[in-house]
Curated annotation (Swiss-Prot):
Residues 292-336 are annotated as: Disordered. Forms part of the ribosomal stalk, playing a central role in the interaction of the ribosome with GTP-bound translation factors. Part of the 50S ribosomal subunit. Forms part of the ribosomal stalk which helps the ribosome interact with GTP-bound translation factors. Forms a heptameric L10(L12)2(L12)2(L12)2 complex, where L10 forms an elongated spine to which the L12 dimers bind in a sequential fashion. The gene is rpl10. The keyword Translocase does not apply. This is Large ribosomal subunit protein uL10. GO terms for molecular function: large ribosomal subunit rRNA binding; structural constituent of ribosome. One of its GO terms (biological process) is ribosomal large subunit assembly. Gene3D superfamilies: 3.30.70.1730, 3.90.105.20, 6.10.140.760. The keyword Zinc does not apply. It comes from Methanothermobacter thermautotrophicus (strain ATCC 29096 / DSM 1053 / JCM 10044 / NBRC 100330 / Delta H). Pfam families: Ribosomal_L10 (PF00466), RL10P_insert (PF17777). Belongs to the universal ribosomal protein uL10 family. Residues 307-327 have a biased composition (Acidic residues).
Length: 336
């Protein structure tokens, strides 16, 4: 039986204890990270996370050992690549991923490296005077030409598609054009929390879209709650306001006197009285006394009482239609 070095046993045990001691364990790739940037990242995470580099075999053994007590944690071994490291933290794995992604910096193209996204040479002046580089640009498919004594690119051109290797010639041209298509930083491949492993694609969140989706869901839930008269802290004011509006419209159109409707009903009755007097005066001028004639001649132009009632009724009908539409929208969104 081969002898196992004591330091290896100690390393596996220490890694095992760290895995068990933190809520979140991440597996990262530190390949090609400059020492200065790695040191800076360690300092940034000093109070919230621990980065521990080790050999692949020792990390695998530690994860396997911890997997006997923590379900599924050993599956992190499947995501080891490059120069592996374990990251231990108690912060949310999505927050950890965002911190690491935000810390990445642009880097020049390297021959053989995989393009993370489409690499585009943009339209415009390259800054180069006419010379051999024109042929080199055209050789790799870039639509370059001479214009006003400068080499310009006619239109945006994709030289390497996402997921493809960067050819040596393309890498050289990109460097000369000062295009840095790669990123250097701690590459978190997966994170373990509460028996669940989150891969990088899951941890990648479009914050603007997520916020927009949450706002939309809240708005739809709010509309449904208001129209279904479900009382919550957020909907109570709207439900009460809606009930008050309906009560007011009912009281007004049914001529029920309240502190809110009395003034309007008196104004309505007064307008109706003047309209009746005007109609009577047209038939028989003597049917209206001098006081009423004076009021008729001085009254301001105003809508007829019937029109007022119709307006209130129309507003109520419009409100009902809007509420039905909002309720339908809310139900449709929640139940597909």
């Amino acid at each position: 039986m081969a002898h196992v070095a004591e330091w290896k046993k100690k390393e596996v045990q220490e890694l095992h204890d760290l895995i068990k001691g933190y809520e979140v364990v991440g597996i990262a790739n530190l390949a090609d990270i400059p020492a200065r940037q790695l040191q800076k990242m360690r300092q940034t995470l000093r109070d919230s996370a621990l980065i521990r580099m080790s050999k692949k075999t020792l990390i695998s053994l530690a994860l396997e050992k911890a997997g006997r007590e923590l379900e599924n944690v050993d599956s992190l071994s499947d995501y080891m690549e490059g120069q592996p490291a374990l990251i231990f933290t108690d912060m949310n794995p999505f927050k950890l991923f965002k911190i690491l992604e935000d810390s990445k910096t642009p880097a020049p193209a390297k021959p053989g490296a995989i393009a993370p996204d489409d690499i585009v040479v943009p339209k415009g002046d390259t800054g180069f005077a006419p010379g051999p580089i024109l042929g080199e640009l055209q050789q790799i498919g870039i639509p370059a030409k001479i214009e006003k004594g400068k080499i310009v690119v006619s239109n945006d051109h994709v030289v390497v598609k996402a997921g493809e290797e960067i050819p040596p010639k393309v890498a050289g041209i990109l460097t000369r054009l000062d295009i840095q298509p790669l990123e250097v930083g701690i590459d978190l491949r997966a994170a373990y929390e509460n028996q669940t492993v989150y891969t990088a694609d899951v941890l990648t969140i479009d914050e603007e879209k997520t916020l927009s989706d949450i706002q939309k869901a809240f708005s739809q839930a709010f509309n449904l709650s208001v129209n279904a008269v479900i009382y919550t802290r957020e909907t109570m004011p709207a439900i009460i306001q809606k009930a008050a509006s309906k009560s007011f419209n009912l009281a007004y159109n049914a001529s029920i006197l309240t502190s809110e409707t009395t003034d309007l009903l008196l104004a309505k009755a007064y307008a109706q009285m003047l309209a009746l007097a005007a109609a009577a005066a047209e038939i028989n001028d003597e049917a209206v006394d001098d006081e009423l004639k004076e009021k008729l001649s001085s009254r301001a132009a105003a809508p007829a009482p019937e029109e007022k009632e119709e307006e209130v009724e129309e507003e109520a009908e419009e409100e009902e239609e809007e509420e039905e539409e909002d309720a339908a929208a809310g139900l449709g969104a929640l139940f597909g």
